Amino acid sequence: MQRDFAFIQTGPDRVFVGWGPFEQAPMRRPGRPAFFIADFFLDDPHPWRHPSSWEELSFAALAARFQPGESAQVTWTPPSIDEFAPLFESAIAAMHRGEFRKIVPVLFESGTGRIDWRVLLERLPSLPPHMWAYGYSYQSHGLIGATPELLFRSQGRGYATMALAGTRPIARAAELLSDADRKSVV
């Protein structure tokens, strides 16, 4: 049985890793690292995962924590362009009406089966230099990905972050407190 974990890249060949078991909570607890692991629709009432231990290390050191597994065998369910196209067209029309200034189209592709985390983690250093990796494995499901937006950066004994899509100026922060706004912004 593989131990639950979550990671986020913090620099070239540096990754912050949280190891399970994770404590689930509705809010992040001050003074402790936490990972926001929620479903896409933000329906989980306890999306924050506080690891029992954490560390920062290289991708190679992280990959070495995993035993070589069996060959990955995943059955993929491809995204449906027939479902996506009308939603995308609707979003473009809303932008033209001035309802949105930016949209982030999303397609879902999911797979079932087994993966070899060691192999995936060993491949992460070969990502293009402008891509930043993140992922988790938690209670028999997981995700691994990369984004062109730097999520966190090691800075001395701490971490720095940047504003991401969906953020608001501080003067408009109260708008994010309503559930409807939170779902439309996040």
Model feature map: region roles:
Residues 19, 30-32, 153-186:
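Cytosolic ligand/metal-binding cores
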Residues 93-101, 126-127, 138-141, 153-158, ...:
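Secondary-structure boundary elements
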Residues 38-40, 107-109, 136-140, 146-148, ...:
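Short, structured patches in soluble enzyme cores that scaffold and shape functional sites
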Residues 10-118, 134, 156:
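Non-catalytic accessory segments adjacent to catalytic cores
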Residues 11-12, 50-54, 147-149, 163-167:
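Secondary-structure transition/turn motif
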Residues 2-12:
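Short, hydrophobic/proline-enriched secondary-structure or compact coil segments at domain edges
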Residues 87-91, 120-123, 131, 139, ...:
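Short, hydrophobic/aromatic alpha-helical segments in well-folded domains
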Residues 113-155:
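SIR2/sirtuin-family catalytic core signature
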